[in-house]
Each structure stands twice: as C-alpha cells, then as structure tokens.
C-alpha cells in the first residue's frame, strides 16, 4: 500500500515484475506477448509507472525510513540483472522518491552522475522527482540541472547539445513545479513560449505523447 514499507539500509526495494500474461475465453488459454506483434518499446512506460508505484510504497515517516544518498544509489540495477526493464523501473523509482520528498537526500555528485551516465528514462524520472521534491522553492541547484536538459534555459552562447524531446518536456514540467506559485515573470514567459511552439513540419515532436 501507499507509504507502508520501511526501507532497510542493507536491502534494495523490491519492484514486482509486471504480469503481461492474459487469459483468452472461453477456455482460459494463456496468451503471451511473445505470440503477438507488438511495438518494441511497448513495455517502456508501463515499466516506468511500475517503478513509480513501487517507490510510492516507501514510508515518509522519519522513524521508519533509512533513505539517504547511499541507499538510493544502492538501488541502481546491477549489470547482471536479467530484467530488461530494470533501468526504466529504476527511473520510475527515482520519480517516486521525489514525489515523497526523499530525493532531496540524493547527493549533488550522484544526481549529476545520473544525468550524465543514465538513460533518457533516468533523466526524466530524476528531473521530475527533484522538481517535485523542491516544488515552489525556485531552488538554484535544481534549476541548473533542469537547464542542462532544456535549451530555453541555456545562454545563447552555450554549445548546442543533443537533447531528446522527452527530456526537454520533462525539464519544462520541472520548471513549472519548481516555480509553482512564485509568480516569477521570466519563468512564466519561458514556459508559455515553450508550450506555444508548433510541433514542427515533420511532426517529429508528436511521438510518444504520454
């Protein structure tokens, strides 16, 4: 259930595997996804949200949690993990930590390491999680991290970086959370300008709408 699980410093949080097997009437024959033509990334977002739901089980009571920067990084998927969606689930786990306020305990170097070496999903989960943890605070450090993934926050003289559309959207949402209720004129104008941009002539920015 929500916020019912206490963390242990020597154990990682268990993320249950998604059940993607169904039953077909009338005899209840088992249906596996391996027998059906599906998109190669069909499990991507379900796995992300599975990580979020698992992370939201962690308690927020100080006396029942041992969450710190070491424990958060201890939960990183291991290289020998046989779950192909482990990294995506960990990304959702990071977002859940942020929603419950735990991501404020992640060290500065560890957070930058996630952004530099992590996948697109990791960047999305981390940016949204950090912004949710610091909602309405206009935190300078989090703003700098968002700026590394959002061209609109970078100075005109900055080197052009190969940023994915999804991480830029996450960073923009992060700006909205971080500056929520502050009435910061520059950030309001920036968000409105970004939201008003057309998708482009080839609609390359209209994929993966979730």
Regions found by a protein language model. Give the residues of each.
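Alpha-solenoid helical-repeat scaffolds
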Residues: 1-210
